[in-house]
Regions:
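Peripheral/terminal regions associated with large enzymatic or DNA-binding modules
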Residues: 1-67, 71-256
Length: 256
């Protein structure tokens, strides 16, 4: 069985996030959680969190779950998460499935979509070995200053594009982002801040959850491949234009 470590980024100096953090712990149930709550720049706390999960978590851990303190999780979170990991054990799972096409995909009876860069920070899963590769890539294959300038979730999207990987997103998803709590990064007006298809709106058990049938939606963001060109060593022109052309199919692009 896959063993899962849990890391939660928490900002205890914001009162409403103290309450939401306690709510999340209650929803997760009895489990060992490592929280990262030192007041430091985005790039610094995220590196400490990733390093702990890849290098310091118990040796039997195979997958690393990352959550923010302002999310809620489904009542059957653990059972569903294990099923998802079993479907794509070697892939990154972006649990914040906030693509505008998510409700349409659910209405078509499909339980997954993929992007090449669409990871959003409130919740995601890394296979542990892949996380170690990501950390090495961050150290060796980025130009100086890149890790400081690029936010942690965008950096994972850049990594996925650089490695030619897809990110898998479940529909509906099993987390919900509580946007009644103000963003600690002033992202309150971000148009893709909230998941559009969760367990509250759709029943995943009625959908085709075979990940091999996932709908591929290509690039989620307009310019992440240009970040690759700017900051990734040996970013090949052919790879750049492959990403440029990997656009969301027209029938799923409304609202992007």
């Amino acid at each position: 069985m896959n063993e899962i470590s849990i890391a939660i980024s928490h900002t205890p100096w914001i009162e409403e996030r103290v309450a939401s953090f306690q709510r999340l712990l209650g929803q997760l149930g009895p489990c060992e959680v490592m929280s990262f709550q030192d007041r430091m720049p985005n790039w610094a706390w995220s590196f400490l969190m990733w390093h702990w999960a890849a290098m310091e978590a118990p040796v039997n851990v195979t997958h690393c779950l990352f959550l923010q303190d302002d999310v809620e999780v489904a009542p059957d979170f653990w059972a569903q998460l294990r099923q998802m990991i079993a479907q794509v054990p070697y892939e990154i799972i972006g649990l914040e499935s906030c693509h505008p096409a998510a409700p349409k995909i659910a209405s078509e009876g499909i339980g997954w979509y993929t992007t090449i860069d669409g990871l959003v920070g409130p919740g995601y899963v890394f296979p542990r070995q892949l996380l170690a590769d990501f950390i090495g890539w961050r150290k060796r294959e980025l130009m100086p200053g890149a890790a400081v300038r690029i936010s942690e979730d965008t950096l994972i999207g850049v990594y996925a594009m650089a490695r030619g990987r897809k990110i898998y997103h479940p529909v509906p998803t099993i987390i919900d982002h509580d946007t009644s709590i103000k963003s600690s990064y002033l992202n309150d007006e971000h148009k893709h801040r909230r998941t559009l298809a969760t367990w509250r709106t759709h029943d995943r058990s009625t959908l085709d959850c075979d990940a091999s049938n996932a709908v591929h939606l290509g690039r989620f963001y307009e310019s992440n491949h240009w970040l690759c060109r700017q900051y990734v060593y040996d970013w090949a022109p052919q790879r750049h234009w492959t990403c440029e052309l990997d656009r969301c199919p027209e029938q799923y692009a409304e609202g992007l």
